[in-house]
Structures are given as C-alpha cells and as structure tokens.
Amino acid sequence: MTIVADVRPDLMPYYKEDCDPKNLAPLWEVLHTFARKTPKSDCQPYIWHYNEIRDTLMKSADLITAEQAERRVLILENPGMRGRYRVTTSLFAGLQLIMPGEIAPAHRHTQAALRFIVEGSGAYTAVDGEKTYMEEGDFVITPSWTWHDHGNESDQPMVWLDGLDVPLVETLDTTFAEPYPEKNQSGTRPSGDSLARYGMGLAPVDYEPQSPNSPIFNYPYARTREALETMRKTEEWDACHGLKLRYVNPDNGKAAMPTIGTFMQLLPKGFETATYQSTDATVFSVVEGSGKSIIGDQTFEWSKRDHFVVPCWVPQRHIANEDAVLFSFSDRPVQQTLGLWRENRGNA
C-alpha cells in the first residue's frame, strides 16, 4: 500500500462527485458538527404569557369542536424550530382546551403524554377504564399505548398543558396510533382506584409491576403543595433550585414516566437561584406567584399560568418576587438512562 505524501485538495470536488451517486459522504467535512466542545441546539429561550394567548385559545372553540379536532390544542412552538411542532428538540408541548359538555374521543398511541392542569376544575381524563377528575396544579399521566379520553362535566372551560415525547418517538421511528372503537371508554374501575391502590405507601399483596410507568396516573396538587409547605420548615434551600421535588414511580423510585421527567419546585419570596446549566432542555409552567428568569442573556418576567422554555446547557437563574411554585418537565430520564445527562451548578 502506497502512503501518499502530498495530498491534492484541489481534486476533492471530483472525489465528492464520485461519492454522491454511491450514497457516500466524507466524514471529515462534517466531523466538527458531531464532536463539539459544548452542545448546540436550535431550541431558543421563549415565554408564552397566558394573558396574551388565552383569548386566542378560547377562540378556537368557535372554530372547531373537541370531537372534530380529536385534540383541540395550540402548540407551544419553539421560535427556533418553527414548523417542526416541538418546544424542545425532543419534546412537544401545547395547551389543550375542553369546553363544558365536550368529549375528546378515546385513542391510544406510542407517545407518552402528561397533562398539567392550568385552568378550571372538574373535567376528567380516563386512562384504561379509570376516570380521574382534575384540579388546577394536578399532574396526570397517560402512558404509552394506554387508552385515554377527556371530558368536561363542569360549567367552565378547562385548560391544561400537554407534554409529549412525540419528537423522540419520531426519531426512533416507533410511532403507532389507534382509535378506540367507541367515542369514549366504559368505566371499569372507580375514580381514584389507582391512587388508593398504589399511592398511599401500600400496594396489593400480590402486585407485581408490569410497566416502567407509574401505576398512579393522577398526582394531586393538594398533596404536592402540602409536601412543599411542610419541607420548607427545615429551611434547607438548594442554591440552584430552592426546594425542588421530582414526581416518582412508587414501584421503583424512578421518574413517573420513563421518557419525561417531571418536577415541582418552590422559590420563597426574594429567593435568587445560583446560575445553573443542564443538558435537559426544560419547559416550565408557573403554578403560583411571580418572578423573573435570566436565561442566557435574556430576562423573562413571569406570573401565574405563564410557560417558558430553557434550552439545553443555557445558563439560567430564577428570582421570585413572592412565593412562587413552578412545575417543569424535560427528557432527563432518557439522558440519565443513556449516561448522557450532566449539569453545571455554577457558583453554588
């Protein structure tokens, strides 16, 4: 084999012409895009102020019913990825509206979904035959390939944040979906059954977990808020997060959903977090209070029901004007399982 001492870069265009019809490409021309010192993402910081978008969301009810739309949702589309229907590189987010008396028909799909209740009270989600009635701040899961439908038996509009792993599932080419044979499911278990069975620190004596998903599908905000309020008495505040809890699967202590991590945190009045970075781009929903977040070189003022996104590895700080509670979700469980997740706690 002859070792070439003098390369001929002037011949490279002809070489690439030879590669192209054979579906080949020289790695050396793109290697720098694969091996970077730090992550690069199309995801951009952004905030959706609820008082600016609520009217637009409500107008959708004059144009299409929940049944016609199947899911009447306004996508929270990241400005850096317009037309790609995602809030981060791997996650979808949107605000879903169910008006009084409406039903969003039952279906199932391989994408896992979360519902975080933003406005209203008394609507339900049914998952595999069990209804759960939802209140503001409740966190509800519909695991991959479970039948689910929604209905509003109250006299007021119901709005919740949808979070799904749609882009991740698309990347893996594992998308399947199926409509239920009827408009909605028949109830096979009483409301609250899963919480009673698995959410009280107890489980049926012969119970053997069959799924990586939590057997609980509604985590009521009243219980979460009580936990935060009790824990704040110890005055043990994390410099980067205040007081932050994660929702867990009681079967194994891992995330409630294997592809989406979910969190709730309390920032006391006047608290300013230390600078923090992590590889999981994160979507926040403001449950209580007001404040501001410095994300990269931008400052975003937020209050109740606003939603904002922090991209991967972009420095973030949060400042609470008053006691503030923030719900958030990200793809952290996936990154941790693959050994990819990392954080930088800055000056903490």
Task: Name what the model sees in each region.
Residues 148-149, 168-170, 254, 269, ...:
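Flexible loop/turn segments at secondary-structure boundaries
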Residues 267, 280-290, 299-311, 325-327, ...:
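Active/binding-pocket-proximal capping segment
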Residues 80, 97-102, 110, 118-121, ...:
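Short, flexible loop/turn elements at secondary-structure junctions
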